[in-house]
Amino acid sequence: DRTSRGLGDVYKRQLKNSVKVTFNENGTDVEEEFDKLIVAVGRKPNSSNIIDESLNIAIEEGFIKVDEHCQTSVKNIWAIGDVVRGPMLAHKGSEEGIMVAERIADKHAEVNYDLVPSVIYSHPEIAWVGKNETELKDKKISYKVGKFPFAASGRALAVDQSVGFVKVLSDSKTDTILGVHVFGPAAAEIVQQALISMEFGASAEDIALTMFSHPTVSEAFHEAALAANNQAIHIGNKTR
């Protein structure tokens, strides 16, 4: 575990096509070489100079404070997207905009903030939706894990993109899917399938009983759902 380390100097080594990084570990400067350095410093809400202070709209740590329907502390003033709480994602902001427009028109609309998909457009891609294992453990929710590697996927092997896996987390009692995490080819598309399933309250068994085209990388989602109940076909299952 090398989290929370103070970063020092960073050098790009042209001849080796690598990056040399200095960081502090237990009070000592350590220098190591890596293939790549990903800079992920986060973002801040750009809420300054867009609100008339005389309106007295509540601001919390730079974010415009809103309720679950994006209503601010002032009646008839709404805020959406990156200036309000939650992940700074275009699709989340877009859905909030639709919800607000619907509610202004006196129609009922909601955003399910428990099912906001996230994607890292790296290579391989990383995508997830729902809960992760740490969150489930913190909430003391008993869950099952189904995991399927792309190394066992015929389509992934055929296109030479077999690195990664699909992980399905489902409730131990109800089998309801609680989270899906994908690292590998077409991760963003696979997670979208998972998101639709979760919106309708699908169980791992529901996905297991669904026919998937072969060969496709999305079969990995099918196999991971099967694996959640020790019924995987193309990999070994856990000993009961």
Language-model regions, residue ranges each:
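A short, glycine/Asx- and small/polar-enriched loop/turn
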Residues: 14-19, 74, 159-164
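Short beta-strand and adjoining strand-loop segment in the mid-core
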Residues: 24, 83-89, 119-126
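Flexible, glycine-rich terminal cap/loop adjacent to redox cofactors
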Residues: 122-132, 137-240
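Single conserved hydrophobic/aromatic residue that forms the stacking wall/gate
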Residues: 1-11
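Conserved beta-strand-loop-beta-strand element in the redox core of flavoprotein oxidoreductases
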Residues: 15-31
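FAD-site-proximal beta/loop scaffold in flavoenzymes
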Residues: 31-104, 110, 189, 197
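Short, structured loop/turn "capping" segments at alpha-beta junctions
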Residues: 107-113, 142-145
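Flexible, acidic loop-helix segments that line cofactor/substrate-binding pockets
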Residues: 13, 109-125
